[in-house]
Curated annotation (Swiss-Prot):
GO biological process, one term: methylation
SUPFAM superfamilies in the cross-refs: S-adenosyl-L-methionine-dependent methyltransferases
Keyword Methyltransferase appears in the UniProt entry: yes
Name of protein: Ribosomal protein L11 methyltransferase
Major localization listed first in the record, in broad terms: cytoplasm
Subcellular location: Cytoplasm
EC number(s) per entry: 2.1.1.-
Chain positions recorded as S-adenosyl-L-methionine binding sites: T139, G163, D185, N232
Keywords of this entry: Cytoplasm, Methyltransferase, S-adenosyl-L-methionine, Transferase
Length: 298
């Protein structure tokens, strides 16, 4: 049936979540969602039947096992089933509910309403196939870091969000009072998701500029640099991008870096300090960490 979807379920170690997300996205999946299953994590993702044959799914299962082996984790267990479009549209959404993050944020799926008498800043999100629902520890750490940074320094800021995903961090920064956020992502699906969520949260495009690309695009848009940088992507990509990110920075610029496993923190720190950055704080959650950095003062 042309309107059928494969529902792919992966049971894995929690530490593999971001790797599994990446692999499923690279495979072409949409609507990824996670749920805790005792000490494991269940990841569900969906792809149209016409885009994947059984041999493709078998190959995906093998790639997931190879990814886990390389990282030193137990092999994930994968299975799949066909479902019609109506079931797909509702199935993955069942796993995602309203959640509080930090002291000020409430993450609300687009199809739900926030509770009455809510006093928190509401971020409404429909992620589509983009990463960033607020359930991942790295997203939570970044939002909490933004909350601390922008609450303690309330003057208007210009911020760059590198690898914006669903736009959740950019939107959070605007709600906390950032003057303007420039969001970029190399994935066109992420760019579209961020634009949709900008509209969903009724944010003026003048306050949240969204472009496909990476740091080079930001350097053209913001030649005078930014006050803050948020970057929730893989550690290897952060390391590769730092020479360009340095060009975005002013002497007073701060940064929030995540997507980094605790075991990778030292490698990231080692390349930051020679390039003029100081790690002011390191927050951990599960196997993940977030580095709060600032320019080193001579």
């Amino acid at each position: 049936m042309s309107n059928s979807w494969w529902e792919i379920t992966v049971l894995c170690e929690p530490s593999l979540e971001e790797t599994v997300f990446w692999r499923l996205e690279d495979f072409g999946c949409s609507g990824t969602a996670t749920a805790k299953k005792q000490s494991s994590l269940e990841v569900k993702a969906y792809i149209p039947e016409i885009k994947a044959q059984l041999l493709d799914l078998e190959a995906l299962s093998l790639w997931l096992k190879q990814d886990a082996l390389i990282l030193g984790f137990p092999e994930p267990v994968s299975h799949w089933q066909l479902m019609d479009e109506e079931d797909w549209a509702s199935s993955w959404k069942q796993h995602w509910q309203i959640s509080e993050i930090g002291d000020r944020f409430l993450i609300c799926p687009a199809w739900l309403n926030p509770p009455e008498n809510n006093q928190r800043l509401v971020i409404k999100i429909d992620p589509g196939s983009a990463f960033g629902t607020g359930t991942h520890p790295t997203t939570q750490l970044c939002l909490e870091s933004l909350e601390m940074r922008l609450s303690s320094h309330p003057e208007p800021k210009i911020i760059a969000d590198i690898g914006c995903g669903s736009g959740i961090l950019a939107i959070g920064a605007i709600l906390l009072g950032a003057k303007k956020v420039y969001a970029v992502d190399t994935d066109p699906l992420a760019v579209n998701a961020t634009r949709s969520n900008r509209h969903l949260n009724r944010i003026n495009p003048e306050n949240l500029a969204i472009n496909q690309g990476s740091v080079e695009e930001l350097l053209e848009l913001i030649p005078d640099g930014v006050d803050g940088i948020v970057c929730n992507i893989l550690a290897e990509t952060i390391i590769a991008l730092m020479p360009e990110i340095n060009r975005l920075a002013k002497p007073t610029t701060w940064g929030i870096l995540s997507g980094i496993l605790v075991t990778q923190a030292q490698a990231v720190t080692d390349i930051l300090e020679p390039q003029g950055w100081t790690v002011a704080a390191l927050w951990k959650r599960q196997e993940w960490c977030c580095l709060q950095i600032r320019r080193a003062l001579d």
